[in-house]
Amino acid sequence: MSKKIKLNDEIIVRVGKYKGKTGKIKKIFSDGKAIIEGINISKKHKKPTPNEKQSGGIFEKEQPISLSNVAIFNIDTNKPDKVKFKIEKGKKYRIFKSNGKKIK
């Protein structure tokens, strides 16, 4: 089955702390979550390890967010949109529901 949201899609967060922010999908997990560029960032504290020659400090890490909380972002309308599928000449395409344009 084809997925409606794929890697490198421009998305917008619909609910929660980051509502209204946009970003690109970096990684999608099988449990229905995704890592989105610049969204849901947490700070991790790490001690230095002299054996591995790694310095310690505070590092920022992007955490997964549920795909049910995001929607694909339509650049033409500047709004979140829904996705539907269309088959032309034996090929399946994803298109925006509002204006019928193909998703790149």
Curated annotation (Swiss-Prot):
Molecular function via GO: rRNA binding; structural constituent of ribosome
Assigned keywords, A-Z: Ribonucleoprotein, Ribosomal protein, RNA-binding, rRNA-binding
Coiled coil, from the record: none
GO cellular component, one term: ribosome
Region: Disordered, residue numbers: 41-61
SUPFAM superfamilies recorded: Translation proteins SH3-like domain
One Pfam family hit: ribosomal_L24
Domain of life of the source: Bacteria
Gene Ontology process terms (BP): translation
Subunit structure: Part of the 50S ribosomal subunit.
Stated role: One of two assembly initiator proteins, it binds directly to the 5'-end of the 23S rRNA, where it nucleates assembly of the 50S subunit.
Family stated for the protein in its record: Belongs to the universal ribosomal protein uL24 family.
HAMAP family: Ribosomal_uL24_B (MF_01326_B)
Name of this protein: Large ribosomal subunit protein uL24
